[in-house]
C-alpha cells in the first residue's frame, strides 16, 4: 500500500514523524512524505534519519537554478500550494493520505476532487488544536468546513479525546491510536537503586503549556530539606524573557546550585538514566512521548490532576502521583524524594504499563484502520 504522510514544514527534525514513517516502511508499505517548504525542511537528529526507502516529496524545495529558487522562495511565502499538492497526488496516486495538521488537510483537499481516504491526526488535546478554526471569519470557516468534510477518519491519542472534537467539524469516525513507545527489557531499565538525587523535566521551555516554572516553584518549597537534590529542565529554548523570569526566581530563592535550565539535548535516554524522578508540570499533552519513554525505561512521575492526557498516563499512586496544585506538587515530590523503594515500585509499574504501547501493537491498529479504509487493497496487512 502507498501511504502519503503530509506535513507542510519542519519535516526532518520531527523525530516522531521519521519514526512513524520508518515503522510503516518496515511493514512493507511504500511511504511518501509530502511537504511544502523552501527553507524549513529541518535536519534529522542522529538516530532519527529516514530509512532509504522512505521518499521525501517537497513541492517547494530548492533546485540548482537560482532563478527558479527565487520564484519558489516567493511562492512558498505568498501563494497557496493546493495546486502543487494536487499535481503531486495525481502523480503519486497514494492509497491513503495522512495529514499531520489541519493546514496539511487544506493542502490536499482545496479545489481538489480525488476520493482518496484521508486520516486527520490530532497531535494534542483537540480543542487546543482545532478550536482556532471556530474563531475565523464566516467565509474562512466555510472553506475550512469543506476540507474537514473530506476526512474519512480522525485519529486522536487518548480515548477521552474522542468526544472532544467540536460538532462543527462533523466527525463521523474517530479512532484512538496512541503513539508507539520504545520498549526496554527489565535489565535495560534505569537503575533506581543507585540514587542520583536528580529530578528532570524534558519539555520545551515554554510558559503557557509546558510550565516549567511550576516545577521550580514547587521545588523551592522543599529545597532546603533536600540540599543534595537537583532539578534539571531540558528542552528547546526559544523564549528568553520567560527564561529570565525563571532564572530571576531561582536567584531570588537561592536555588542557583540546585535548579538549572539545561537546554536541548539529543541524548534524552541518557537523561532518564541519570535521574530518579521525572516531574511533568505540563497543562496539556496529546500523548507525551517524554512521559511514555521515561516510563518505559522505568522512571516514576509527578504531574497535575487537571492536565489533559498527563492525568491518564500517570495513574495516581501506581506509577506516580497527580497533584492538585503547586503545594501538592511539592508534597508529592517530597514523598518520592524520601522513599527510594516507592520510586522503584512506581518505576517498575510505569515500565509495565508502557507495554500496551509497544510498536507492534500500535502499528497493528494502524493496519486495521488501513484495511477498513481500503478493504480491496491486497497489500493491506490484516
What are the residue ranges of the model-derived segments?
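Membrane-proximal helix-turn-helix segments that form the acceptor-binding/catalytic region
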Residues: 86-87, 136-154
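Short hydrophobic beta-strand element within catalytic cores of glycosyltransferases
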Residues: 300-304
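Conserved acidic donor-binding segment of nucleotide-sugar-dependent glycosyltransferases
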Residues: 305, 315-327, 335-341, 355
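Glycosyltransferase donor-sugar binding loop
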Residues: 35-41, 202, 230-245
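A conserved mid-protein helix/loop that constitutes part of the nucleotide-sugar donor-binding site
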Residues: 14-19, 197, 206-221, 231, ...
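Aromatic "clamp/platform" in nucleotide-sugar-dependent glycosyltransferases that forms part
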Residues: 264, 283
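A short, active-site helix/loop in glycosyltransferases that binds the activated sugar's phosphate group
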Residues: 106-109, 146-173, 181-183
Amino acid at each position: 500500500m502507498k501511504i502519503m504522510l503530509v506535513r507542510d514544514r519542519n519535516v526532518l527534525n520531527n523525530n516522531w514523524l521519521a519514526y512513524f514513517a520508518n515503522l510503516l516502511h518496515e511493514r512493507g508499505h511504500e511511504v511518501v512524505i509530502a511537504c511544502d517548504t523552501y527553507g524549513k525542511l529541518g535536519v534529522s537528529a542522529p538516530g532519527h534519519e529516514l530509512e532509504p526507502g522512505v521518499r521525501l516529496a517537497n513541492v517547494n524545495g530548492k533546485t540548482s537554478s537560482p532563478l527558479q529558487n527565487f520564484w519558489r522562495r516567493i511562492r512558498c511565502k505568498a501563494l497557496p500550494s493546493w495546486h502543487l499538492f494536487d499535481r503531486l497526488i495525481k502523480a503519486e496516486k497514494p492509497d491513503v493520505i495522512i495529514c499531520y495538521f489541519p493546514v496539511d488537510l487544506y493542502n490536499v483537499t482545496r479545489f481538489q476532487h480525488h476520493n482518496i481516504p484521508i486520516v486527520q491526526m490530532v497531535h494534542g488535546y483537540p480543542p487546543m488544536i482545532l478550536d482556532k478554526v471556530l474563531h475565523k471569519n464566516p467565509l474562512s470557516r466555510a472553506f475550512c468546513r469543506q476540507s474537514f468534510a473530506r476526512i474519512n477518519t480522525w485519529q486522536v491519542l487518548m480515548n477521552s479525546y474522542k468526544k472532544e472534537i467540536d460538532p462543527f467539524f462533523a466527525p463521523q469516525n474517530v479512532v484512538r491510536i496512541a503513539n508507539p513507545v520504545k520498549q526496554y527489557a527489565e535489565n535495560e531499565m534505569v537503575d533506581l537503586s543507585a540514587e542520583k538525587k536528580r529530578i528532570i523535566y524534558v519539555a520545551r521551555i515554554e510558559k503557557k503549556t509546558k510550565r516549567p516554572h511550576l516545577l521550580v516553584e514547587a521545588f523551592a518549597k522543599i529545597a532546603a530539606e533536600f540540599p543534595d537534590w537537583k532539578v534539571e529542565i531540558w528542552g528547546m529554548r526559544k523564549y528568553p524573557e520567560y527564561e529570565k523570569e525563571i532564572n530571576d526566581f531561582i536567584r531570588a530563592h537561592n536555588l542557583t546550585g540546585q535548579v538549572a535550565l539545561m537546554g536541548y539535548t539529543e541524548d534524552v535516554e541518557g537523561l532518564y538514566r541519570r535521574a530518579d524522578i521525572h516531574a511533568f508540570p505540563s497543562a496539556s499533552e496529546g500523548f507525551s512521548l517524554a512521559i511514555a519513554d521515561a516510563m518505559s525505561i522505568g522512571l516514576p512521575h509527578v504531574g497535575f490532576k487537571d492536565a489533559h492526557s498527563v492525568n491518564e498516563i500517570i495513574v495516581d499512586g501506581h506509577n506516580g502521583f497527580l497533584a492538585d496544585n503547586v503545594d501538592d506538587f511539592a508534597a508529592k515530590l517530597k514523598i518520592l524524594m524520601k522513599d527510594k523503594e516507592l520510586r522503584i515500585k512506581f518505576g517498575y509499574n510505569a515500565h509495565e504499563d508502557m507495554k500496551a504501547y509497544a510498536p507492534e501493537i500500535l502499528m497493528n491498529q494502524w493496519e486495521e484502520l488501513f484495511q477498513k479504509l481500503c478493504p480491496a487493497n491486497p497489500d493491506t496487512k490484516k
